[in-house]
Design a protein with these regions (language model features):
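PLP-dependent amino-acid enzyme catalytic core
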Residues: 1-228
Length: 228
């Protein structure tokens, strides 16, 4: 998907805005699981979630390409905090579209980060359709939830984990839109590790199926990994 040099470039962008987050092998988790268990604390990022890494890389690269017009995206929360945080750093305006009834705390955070927030529709798909329509009407750039530069940024968290913890037997990664697990696989492969990467999704895999449709619509292919 990208090269080691591109990952190094992404790392420089991320670390200009935030330090690496910690990872710890917690004794109580070892007692509960019967094995050494590490936790990567992405709650220590400026927005409390790993997705800000991808937003930082994408928005900086947009600015470097001279793409300085406003951006818009659809989200229920973490992606919607990532984009305005990163956009504000490079002087680009951002608009976020979320469903009606979205978390008030997430909405407040997105507004506080400088986004224009539009609440419409009753699910993510409706919000995304509205965001794409607004993008056309206003001449804004629509940012999908998954893309090369977003994944490049996200890969930095897995790269930090593997460099600190070494070759783990397995890593469990939650699946939403897929950037986290794809970034983890990329980091593992770049470091030449044999760690098993296991995706964890909701029962019924509704989010996973939606993720696969989004990847195919974006022009990519879904990675083959186990779902538990």
């Amino acid at each position: 998907m990208y090269t080691a040099d591109e990952l190094e470039q992404a790392s420089r962008i991320v670390y200009a805005a935030m330090p690496p987050t910690p990872q710890f092998a917690w004794p109580l988790l070892k007692d509960a699981t019967g094995c050494e268990t590490w936790v990567k604390h992405e709650n220590h990022t400026p927005t409390g979630a790993f997705k800000v890494r991808g937003g930082l890389v994408h928005m900086k690269m947009r600015k470097d390409r001279g793409e300085t017009g406003g951006v818009i995206t659809a989200t229920r929360g973490n992606h919607g905090q990532s984009i305005p945080f990163a956009a504000a750093r490079v002087g680009i305006t951002s608009t976020i579209v979320c469903p009606v009834g979205n978390s008030p705390e997430k909405n407040a955070a997105m507004r506080a980060l400088g986004a224009e927030l539009i609440e419409t529709g009753h699910d993510f798909d409706a919000a995304r359709e509205t965001a794409m329509e607004i993008a056309k009407d206003r001449g804004l750039a629509f940012i999908p939830s998954f893309g090369k530069e977003l994944v490049m940024g996200v890969t930095t968290y897995a790269h930090e984990l593997f460099r600190a913890a070494g070759e783990l037997d397995a890593v469990y990664v939650p699946i939403g839109m897929g950037s986290g697990i794809v970034g983890t696989i990329a980091a593992r492969d770049m470091l030449g590790l044999k760690t098993k990467v296991i995706g964890v999704s909701v029962d019924g895999v509704s989010d996973h199926e939606k993720w696969k449709r989004d990847i195919e619509a974006f022009g990519g292919a879904a990675a083959d990994f186990p779902i538990i």
